[in-house]
UniProtKB/Swiss-Prot annotation:
GO biological-process terms attached to the record: cellular response to L-leucine; cellular response to leucine starvation; negative regulation of TORC1 signaling; positive regulation of macroautophagy; regulation of response to reactive oxygen species
Segments of this protein annotated with the region C-terminal domain: 310-481
Compartments where found: Nucleus; Cytoplasm
Comment field on protein domains: The N-terminal domain may have an alkylhydroperoxide reductase activity.
Catalytic activity: a hydroperoxide + L-cysteinyl-[protein] = S-hydroxy-L-cysteinyl-[protein] + an alcohol
Protein name according to UniProt: Sestrin-1
Family recorded in the similarity comment: Belongs to the sestrin family.
Disordered as annotated region, ranges: 295-316
Region (N-terminal domain): 63-244
One Pfam family, short name: PA26
Amino acid sequence: MRLSPRAALSSPEIICSRCSQSCNNKELGIRIPRPLGQGPSRFVPEEEILQLASEDANMHSVFADAFTDLGRLDNITLVMVFHPQYLESFLKTQHYLLQMDGPLSPCYQHYIGIMAASRHQCSYLVNLHVNDFIHHGGDQKWLNGLENAPQKLRNLGELNKMLAHRPWLITKEHIKQLLKAGEHSWSLAELIHAIVLLAHYHSLASFTFGCGINPEIHSNGGHTFRPPSVSNYCICDITNGNHGTEGHLPVGIVMPTDSTCEVEALMVKMKQLQEGRDEEEASQEEMATRFEREKTESMVFSTEDEDPPPDIDVSRHFEDTSYGYKDFSRRGMHVPTFRVQDYSWEDHGYSLVNRLYPDVGQLLDEKFHIAYNLTYNTMAMHKDVDTSTLRRAVWNYVHCMFGIRYDDYDYGEINQLLDRSFKVYIKNVVCSPEKTSKRMYDGFWRQFKHSEKVHVNLLLMEARMQGELLYALRAITRYMT
């Protein structure tokens, strides 16, 4: 049984006295772990998360179901508590992918999760699935490196790296190689299950890094045995959830910034765009030109130049460690635009997934719609705000970076609504999440609430997942026809 580090004690004064006596008794030799992180997230104050979780009565049943399912309440779930409607859909989908009988065995499911998370060096997700893989009786030799896994899983490595970094390169030939590999062949149902898992964990790595998720105290990298350096800090504070005094402002306190009119200016632009839609629309040629311009300009907002040093324990789970995201619009490289009017999730991908992996298409569709349409009609301190224009700009910008175009969308809106710091953040979280820093998180939408920034990360995660699925499912459709 794991005791929560957030369980409050009724008599901290008595415990502190006992702690003091125990600490002075060197003969005991007890090593007490101390959490390295302050709460579930490095970016979001712990008090805001815990306060929200305690105020929403419905969250108790959601948490209970999640704990029953997985035997844990992980920090991703705790950060998603800001958006309970989405969280319920997310947990339901993840439960179906991992807990219900499907084309793939539990060992394969969790190993694919390890492979996917490893592409972005997401040790948090890798460690979760290593534990689950072992729990389900997986062969621990596989964990020594991808070369020790069955050939069938190793064959999935090429699709994994393209899906994670350059999904526009996936063709029906890649699908054929997996389906026609002799004794190591995948069935169509197995491949759909694998692709959904890969896309799920690539995008979940984006959310993990985008929200600065901390490892739990019992996980690798989640604790230390060194004494705290903050004065007047007692070991029993660990169980009270008090991890020191530095790091975050009290709940409700907003840092003063130079951008005091940032929110108001954005709201004015949104209103102008919404009111201007009744005016004469641009021609199809002009709309296409604006898309190409936005796609090309997206390369200006480069991800951080410095690659984080590879984690040996993580990188062993995939091949070709140098393979990463590349701007498809760089000079000398041209990839045809993916027109949603020709192949969309609603008209093509949804039915294909549902046919080969029943009910999953419905669950994914519900999750996409909740993330896309989620709104509380608020922006920072303002209420009764229609945020649909802004949400659509964020979603379509992610797809634009992947070369995916909506014919009925004016891409000129993106430049009006998304400033440079926000575009840099989006590109890092979606394309190279392992490079995301607190500086980037703090640097965009400085007057907005943490719950709103978490909402942004939900949009980025789901837009990325749908983009990956569109390319992979289109390749399968082309193979089948």
